[in-house]
């Protein structure tokens, strides 16, 4: 407000939501994705942040917790995760883990759409899962996207307690709303610029 821009500021939404929804509307017929995801209900998990991977004890706890979830857990091998597990002698093959090679952006969107839930420490994936209507469990103490916490769509679980029940909780019935826009941020931006 001190800059004197309040009268000229327009909230139009997040153009990344525009991209997400555009990709989500495309057919998920990528032959590279075929056969890489379970046909039964699965959880999509991603782990790569330093707070979950740099300490071998914490990393082992996270991997063990994910492996204990009572559903297949698809876990793309992020390079940091792969390297830290290899250095610590931690296997990604145990329990219900289904480790796969990293996914492209479109493949990740389709994997979220096919999942029943998401468990992650990724900032972007929290928001994407929320926008796509999947319950997300964030394995961190905080989120950049506080709007995702409303109604229980995103639950912070840094301590990993009751991870199975938390990750596999029923999808909330509360409306998510569109705090990041409805997929029309680009058009709204152009309209706002044209109106100046």
Task: Please describe what each predicted stretch is.
Residues 1-53, 57:
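A nucleotide-sugar donor-handling region in carbohydrate enzymes
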Residues 59-62, 105-108:
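Acidic, amphipathic alpha-helical patches
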Residues 108-148:
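A donor-sugar binding/catalytic signature common to diverse glycosyltransferases
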Residues 155-196:
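Leloir-type glycosyltransferase catalytic cores
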């Amino acid at each position: 407000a001190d800059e004197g821009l309040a009268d000229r500021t327009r909230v139009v939404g997040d153009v990344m939501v525009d991209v997400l929804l555009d990709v989500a509307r495309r057919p998920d017929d990528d032959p590279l994705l075929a056969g890489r995801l379970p046909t039964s209900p699965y959880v999509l998990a991603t782990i790569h942040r330093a707070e979950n991977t740099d300490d071998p004890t914490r990393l082992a706890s996270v991997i063990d917790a994910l492996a204990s979830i009572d559903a297949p857990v698809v876990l793309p091998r992020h390079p940091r995760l792969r390297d830290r597990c290899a250095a610590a002698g931690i296997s990604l093959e145990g329990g219900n883990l289904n480790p796969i090679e990293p996914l492209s952006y479109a493949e990740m969107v389709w994997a979220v759409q096919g999942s029943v839930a998401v468990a992650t420490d990724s900032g972007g994936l929290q928001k994407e899962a929320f926008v796509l209507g999947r319950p997300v469990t964030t394995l961190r103490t905080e989120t950049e996207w506080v709007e995702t916490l409303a109604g229980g769509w995103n639950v912070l679980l840094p301590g990993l307690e009751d991870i199975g029940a938390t990750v596999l909780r029923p999808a909330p019935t509360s409306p998510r709303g569109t705090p990041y826009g409805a997929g029309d941020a680009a058009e709204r931006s152009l309209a706002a610029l044209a109106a100046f």
